[in-house]
Amino acid sequence: MHRLRIAVFSDVSVAGSEWQWVALDSANCVLAQGQGDPGQWAQTRDVEVLLPASRLVYRQLTMPAASRRQLSKILPFALEDEQLTPPDGSHLAAGVLQGDSVAVAMVARDYLLHLLRRLAEFSIQPRRVVSVLDCLPSDRQDIWHVLLM
């Protein structure tokens, strides 16, 4: 199975000409790569989009046990002071609860919708949208990563 990975590096626009893409085979070997329209690779079923780190906000929250069942309802308000936009203007994604802690990623809904519309113009329907930071190894505590912007 092939996979298409598209990186959006521009923080200003989501114009197709500013995308870097790579098509990978099942062993993660590069089949093709380029910039802008991925052509035939746009029809790939497994599409992942990498957003610029500056477009997301990450937070680690402590959630009371009673609130866990209503996580999706209370997250927007738990992060209200730190959001990029008002609660109804953000898209939130919560990670797996680990004890009483949960990781949350936020992105402005307008930006995400605009990007998805631009991708649809190329017949691209991503299965995943993640930050470029999510691609860094996180299993080692003795390594630091620096992102230059």
Q: PLM features: residue spans?
A:
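Hydrophobic/aromatic-enriched cytosolic interaction surfaces used to assemble or bind macromolecules
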Residues: 1-149
